[in-house]
């Protein structure tokens, strides 16, 4: 229950952060950060999979893994290679059975994982994208609906997509210091 409340409390901050990044990116059209550069010719993608360390979660992990496999297969049919970072021992043990390149994992993180425990494995994907070794990075997790229902999600993490222009005002009165290019870096 505490974890659910923490997740609910963080949602508005995450939404606003994405919106602010979109505003900053639009404010400086001369500069495109590597994380925002769209790559139309997709040759390799990465998935960051968030799962549990223990079982007894009903279909929580299996629904997510099925959703990821469907997405992965659609990319592989197009000749795209796949890399995975698994957070949680259930994801590691599941995806080892498939012909997937697991480039990093973090397991046994406990009830309240610290950012330091995740930075290394997540950075593997970020660096690969920045160095043009990956063309897309997806974040895969179960979205909490209620205690009886979670919805498997596969969301694009990179390239960062700015908010739809229809949701944005024609102008905004933010002053960014330092300049937007430095903030995006």
Short names for language-model regions:
Residues 1-185:
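C-terminal beta-strand-loop-alpha-helix "lid" module of Rossmann-like NAD(P)-dependent dehydrogenases
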